[in-house]
């Protein structure tokens, strides 16, 4: 493998340890294509998520893009926010919770801000899979949730409009190690190939 690819034996060994043990697999690994990605609709609730986002965009409903303050959460928020702007939705805001006063995950403070600002939909990225009570609280304020997470769920899944998480036991998506941002990418990829190319 090292000789065929003209790479160091150390790198070749790392590839083999990760199941990339042929030249064909290595070439695919080093030159990935969008065509190699799994169908986003294999993820549980994806159709519901797409329908709700389309409804919000069509009605110019205010959307809050919400994510944790770590790298995964921030990149997910940046990506989904930019994507929604690219498809023409301008009635947007984003929210990253304060790490010291709110901590990780969905916060009551963030939900209250969304309600005050007239937000009808929160897209939560890299968080929310265990926010059962907070999703119920948001609903009492007239705010819907789409959760795009990758953490292990608890026994009870939040009663959001859609809960996208490849680690759900009832999810048939073939790769359950996506990041939170990766789940957000899957949601965005369903709109237009032109916009997806620019991600």
Mark where each language-model region is.
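Cofactor-/ligand-binding subdomain signature composed of acidic, glycine-rich
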Residues: 1-59
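Short alpha-helical "patches" and their helix-cap loops
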Residues: 25-34, 69, 94, 98-99, ...
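Single conserved hydrophobic/aromatic residue that forms the stacking wall/gate
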Residues: 191-199
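A generic alpha-helix surface/boundary motif
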Residues: 9-10, 78, 182
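Active-site/ligand-binding-proximal alpha/beta "capping" segment
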Residues: 186, 190
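Short beta-alpha connecting loops at secondary-structure transitions
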Residues: 164-175
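N-terminal small/polar loop signature for handling phosphorylated ligands or for N-terminal nucleophile
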Residues: 44-157, 163-164
